[in-house]
């Protein structure tokens, strides 16, 4: 009887450990997906900010050139 309880306890313990390892792996897989989405979002934001900055710089140079041509001080 004692041996049977001992072996059942051992099986329960090993089963619990294997289940927790499976859950950790599943959670790790889920985290990778979230990180990928964040990286994609970060890249898109960076590209958008780069385009805004380039657009502002080009617009400012066009405005300077137009004001110079209109005033005749070029």
UniProtKB/Swiss-Prot annotation:
Q: Which coarse location class applies to the principal site listed for this UniProt protein? A: secreted
Residue ranges annotated as propeptide in the record: 23-41
What protein name is recorded for this chain?
Brevinin-2Ef
One Pfam family in the UniProt entry: FSAP_sig_propep
Family of the protein in this entry = Belongs to the frog skin active peptide (FSAP) family. Brevinin subfamily.
Entry's InterPro entries? Antimicrobial_frog_2, Frog_antimicrobial_propeptide
Protein's cellular compartments: Secreted
**UniProt keywords, alphabetically:** Amphibian defense peptide, Antibiotic, Antimicrobial, Cleavage on pair of basic residues, Cytolysis, Disulfide bond, Hemolysis, Secreted, Signal
- Which organs or tissues contain this protein? Expressed by the skin glands.
One GO CC annotation: extracellular region
Enumerate the Gene Ontology biological process terms: defense response to bacterium; killing of cells of another organism
Record-annotated disulphide pairs: 68-74
Tell me which species this is from.
Answer: Pelophylax lessonae
Q: What does this protein do?
A: Shows antibacterial activity against representative Gram-negative and Gram-positive bacterial species, and hemolytic activity.
| Signal sequence range | 1-22
